Amino acid sequence: MNSTNTVVYIKVKGKRPQGFLDPPKFEWNGTKERQLWTMVSNLNYSQDQIDWQNLSKIFETPEFFLKKRTYKLFAEHLELLQLQLEKKRDLEKYSNDQVNEGMSDLIHKYIPTLQNDNLLNVSASPLTTERQDSEEVETEVTNEALQHLQTSKILNIHKKTSDSENKPNDKLDKDGINKEMECGSSDDDLSSSLSVSKSALEEALMDRL
């Protein structure tokens, strides 16, 4: 509808102008309205405008009324189409929300969340484990070496005690000389036991490695 194919009638109070004719009386019903909509809604795109004169003859209705009803029918169907589009969009949104909720439920159900207990139960890293093993080996080897050293000292002390008990009491001078010699021997034995303990420590370390 535009200014070339549309006529607007305005009703004003006053005398009728000369030559004015009252619009003809006509009958309009739902059947004619459905037929009108079928005709105007199935127009070919190549057709520029509606042939209102032909439609007026078919329906025996004035052109202005047909134009008004056609405009009203298009407006109603456009509004209905808009409602359908909004409804479809709402349904798609609701469906997507349901899908998201379903995925969230699956995630919470089948993928356990990380708890503090899990953090506490995390196994140590290989570097930490290796460091702990090395410290344990060093401690064990050191204890073993100290045990060897202590044993050698005890043997040496026991040997000195038994030798001194077997000697006569009247040979004190010789005992003094022997004690000095035994002290030197004890120092040598201690040095020897230390070297033996050192060798045992090295052998234990090599065995551990």
Swiss-Prot record:
Query: Where found, per UniProt?
Result: Preautophagosomal structure
For this entry, list what GO says about its biological process: autophagosome assembly; protein transport
For this record, the Gene Ontology CC terms, alphabetical, are:
phagophore assembly site
What's the short name of a Pfam family annotated to this entry?
A: ATG29_N
Keywords tagged on the record: Autophagy, Phosphoprotein, Protein transport, Transport
Q: Where is the composition biased (Basic and acidic residues)?
A: 160-182
UniProt main location, coarse: other
Q: Any signal peptide, and if so, which residues? A: none
Phosphoserine modification sites are: 104, 185-186
What segment(s) does the record annotate as region Disordered? 156-198
Protein family: Belongs to the ATG29 family.
- What is the protein's known function? Plays a role in autophagy. Functions at the preautophagosomal structure (PAS) in order to form normal autophagosomes under starvation conditions. Also plays a role in mitophagy and regulation of filamentous growth.
Question: What binding partners and quaternary form does the record give?
Answer: Forms a stable complex with ATG17 and ATG31. Interacts directly with ATG31. The ATG17-ATG29-ATG31 complex interacts with the ATG1-ATG13 complex. Note=The interaction with the ATG1-ATG13 complex is induced by starvation.
The entry's protein name is Autophagy-related protein 29
The gene it comes from is ATG29
